[in-house]
């Protein structure tokens, strides 16, 4: 009878442990947080992101003008908070031949700034998509080619260029992203997969993690409410929300990151507070708690 009780107890314990989230995530990849939610109040963002327990931060190009001649001041703020600059939003890429030289120089300048801040990666986006436009294959290839040129230059500085997929840009749909990625030279530019933009564009971000594992440099971890509650009559409406508050299967994304043994940075991003009643810190706390409770990430 005693042996049976011990067996049942051990069996129940095994079942409980088996049903728990994996506790190995922290050893595989690193979590950062983007300052974009603070709307340009970057010094506040640095303090509050650190207070949430994150060790990495993404800053934007708006920090370049005020700190380009004194990067040591911004780096001192990062160092004091115990934060590493893990990604820098370097802005748009132009493909017009008359603008290519300037666009390359812009990102080279940002790469030098990033290096001075102790970082080693920049994010490239674009504003090339016109209303109701579907870019041609040749246009998407041209974008990849220019990004290859940028990446070649920044790599000389020790800074990795990454392509960020995005709604309302060239690279909105999974098919467009695929064309771009196929023509990227991984030795020069790699992929920063935004899971919510990829989802909203019609893709499965968890599958994209597997598909692009060889070129996956980093990710934006975010969630999206789609359609917006109260706007169901417009199926294309959407807004970005805190982790766990939207429709992206984030747990599966993390499972697949574990499957491919991903060791890079997964950066939590929320473009703005989803409600005027919330603060960036409150939103960050919600997302931090999701990561702690759902994937057992240890902050």
What residue ranges belong to the model's regions?
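Acidic (Asp/Glu)-rich catalytic clusters
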Residues: 46-51, 68-87, 106-118, 148-156, ...
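Mobile, glycine- and charge-enriched loop segments
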Residues: 26-35, 75, 79
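Histidine-acidic metal/acid-base catalytic patches
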Residues: 5-17, 27-31, 39, 43-50, ...
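Short, basic, helix/turn surface patches
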Residues: 83-93, 111-120, 151, 190-197, ...
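N-terminal secretory signal peptides
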Residues: 1-2
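Acidic-and-aromatic substrate-binding clefts and catalytic sites of carbohydrate-active enzymes
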Residues: 36-43, 60-71, 93-103, 130-134, ...
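Hydrophobic faces of well-ordered beta-strands that scaffold small-molecule active sites
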Residues: 29-35, 57-59, 85-90, 122-124, ...
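Active-site acidic/histidine proton-transfer and metal-coordination neighborhood
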Residues: 12-23, 97-191
């Amino acid at each position: 009878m005693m042996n049976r009780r011990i067996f049942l107890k051990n069996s129940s314990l095994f079942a409980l442990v088996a049903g728990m989230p994996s506790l190995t995530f922290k050893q595989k990849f690193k979590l950062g947080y983007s300052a974009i939610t603070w709307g340009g109040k970057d010094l506040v963002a640095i303090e509050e992101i650190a207070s949430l327990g994150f060790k990495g931060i993404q800053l934007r190009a708006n920090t370049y003008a005020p700190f380009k001649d004194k990067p040591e001041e911004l780096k001192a703020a990062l160092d004091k908070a115990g934060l590493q600059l893990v990604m820098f939003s370097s802005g748009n890429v132009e493909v017009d031949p008359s603008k290519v030289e300037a666009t390359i120089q812009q990102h080279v300048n940002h790469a030098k700034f990033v290096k001075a801040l102790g970082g080693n990666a920049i994010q490239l986006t674009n504003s090339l998509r016109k209303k109701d436009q579907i870019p041609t294959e040749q246009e998407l290839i041209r974008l990849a080619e220019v990004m290859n040129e940028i990446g070649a230059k920044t790599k000389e500085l020790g800074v990795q260029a990454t392509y960020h997929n995005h709604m309302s840009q060239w690279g909105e749909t999974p098919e467009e992203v695929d064309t771009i990625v196929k023509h990227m030279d991984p030795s020069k530019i790699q992929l920063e997969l935004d899971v919510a933009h990829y989802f909203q564009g019609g893709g499965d971000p968890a599958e994209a993690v597997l598909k692009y594992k060889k070129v996956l440099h980093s990710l934006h971890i975010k969630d999206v409410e789609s359609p917006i509650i109260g706007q169901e009559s417009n199926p294309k409406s959407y807004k970005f929300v805190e982790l766990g508050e939207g429709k992206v299967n984030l747990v599966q994304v993390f499972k697949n990151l574990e499957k491919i043994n991903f060791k890079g940075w997964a950066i939590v991003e929320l473009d703005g507070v989803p409600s005027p009643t919330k603060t960036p810190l409150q939103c960050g706390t919600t997302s931090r708690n999701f990561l702690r409770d759902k994937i057992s990430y240890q902050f």
